[in-house]
Amino acid sequence: MTTFKEAVTFKDVAVVFTEEELGLLDPAQRKLYRDVMLENFRNLLSVGHQPFHQDTCHFLREEKFWMMGTATQREGNSGGKIQTELESVPEAGAHEEWSCQQIWEQIAKDLTRSQDSIINNSQFFENGDVPSQVEAGLPTIHTGQKPSQGGKCKQSISDVPIFDLPQQLYSEEKSYTCDECGKSICYISALHVHQRVHVGEKLFMCDVCGKEFSQSSHLQTHQRVHTGEKPFKCEQCGKGFSRRSALNVHRKLHTGEKPYICEACGKAFIHDSQLKEHKRIHTGEKPFKCDICGKTFYFRSRLKSHSMVHTGEKPFRCDTCDKSFHQRSALNRHCMVHTGEKPYRCEQCGKGFIGRLDFYKHQVVHTGEKPYNCKECGKSFRWSSCLLNHQRVHSGEKSFKCEECGKGFYTNSQLSSHQRSHSGEKPYKCEECGKGYVTKFNLDLHQRVHTGERPYNCKECGKNFSRASSILNHKRLHCQKKPFKCEDCGKRLVHRTYRKDQPRDYSGENPSKCEDCGRRYKRRLNLDILLSLFLNDT
């Protein structure tokens, strides 16, 4: 027979109010509250649970989950015990049989009539015993015996196997449908709770952060965020979780189980919600929209992180350098800068990366793939972000403005680099010579001087270059492309820098002079390059 490792107690499903909270409820809310509690009671009783356990009675007494006030009470004959009236439940005679369903209906009827009754008695049911009026009828369910008048059954309801209960208890459940979304729900009390989602009603507020919830169970789960409590532990690795559902999802990591498969691409997922979110990538659906800028997102978490950009909120702070971040994942990636950890490594060249996205972007360098094409000029790009930045060149949009000088830029990274020219900040230092640079890109170019790396190769002559701009200028020598023209002598030039030097060339201040056209250059290098052009022309 199947056994359960952890029995569900009445405390697990109880909706708990303090005395102060009960005073804030109006009559309609009190009625809803009573219905929820009675429904929970009924569910536990229907599966053979013993609701009047000693711990349960202590819980009911301490938490005072019923309204204070007008309970009809009387003192018993022994020790001044106080009992709540259950007048409608008669004592079972020797020839009377009472089912659990009948007992439940009688209890519910009485509790409904006196909904303001309190179950906070100091000795509600001594030693966890069920009142004889209620328990007398139970033997016919699990033993078939008929006790004598006033007799007690020695076996508690919790001892009754679930399979021995009458099957009619399960077939009598009704299905209720939500008018708003069409969802089917088994119990009317659960339907009332569900409808709070549509009306936006949130009765339960966190005392720490003020966040509101529609159900007390959600509030209790949320409060573990503040307390740090993680009662659900993984048996495999010992990791703790604040919710049982999170533990169940985590366990699939150990088993490797991924039961939810995408029909479009075949990708498998651990949780059905992950599959549902993934499908939006194929459909293009972005249901989460920012109210401020109108940007849409596939996932609610992305929208939440994006909203912090507008509010300026950066709740995640680095303990090492005090830098703040919008997202915890961004903080985790940043911490790797201090530790030097690079978990993503390229198998082709061995280069390591901190972030998964940077790793994926790098792999495109080896494949040479450029899937993003500009419709204006046909230019191809490896990444969508590069295409987006490029398209601003055609539109002329420069949405990133410098507050110091008013200069506009196509990208935020360009603005950030420019702002360092005002502050004089050069955060990127060369470990070899200590020279500082405004951008990491310039530092990477400089380091090739020390390493001797020249990754750009000319296929025409086999010459190697350390910079992409250098090989681009070099290729013009082979194709005789000279896009720049000297305004003084009309000579076509390969490099834009030659034309910029012209105003000084004819001032007489530059010592290097060309004997063919008479131009002077500030640097001998520029003259040598120009002479090579004359030789190529001849």
Curated annotation (Swiss-Prot):
Primary location: nucleus
KRAB domain span: 8-78
Keyword Lipid metabolism tagged: no
InterPro entries: C2H2-ZF_domain (IPR050752), KRAB (IPR001909), KRAB_dom_sf (IPR036051), Znf_C2H2_sf (IPR036236), Znf_C2H2_type (IPR013087)
Keyword Transferase: no
Cell compartments where the protein resides: Nucleus
GO CC term, one of those recorded: nucleus
First and last residues of each zinc finger (C2H2-type): 176-198, 204-226, 232-254, 260-282, 288-310, 316-338, 344-366, 372-394, 400-422, 428-450, 456-478, 484-506
Disulfide cysteine pairs (residue numbers): none
UniProt KW keywords: DNA-binding, Metal-binding, Nucleus, Repeat, Transcription, Transcription regulation, Zinc, Zinc-finger
Family statement drawn from the similarity comment of this UniProt entry: Belongs to the krueppel C2H2-type zinc-finger protein family.
Role noted for this protein: May be involved in transcriptional regulation.
Protein name according to UniProt: Zinc finger protein 155
Species the sequence originates in: Homo sapiens (Human)
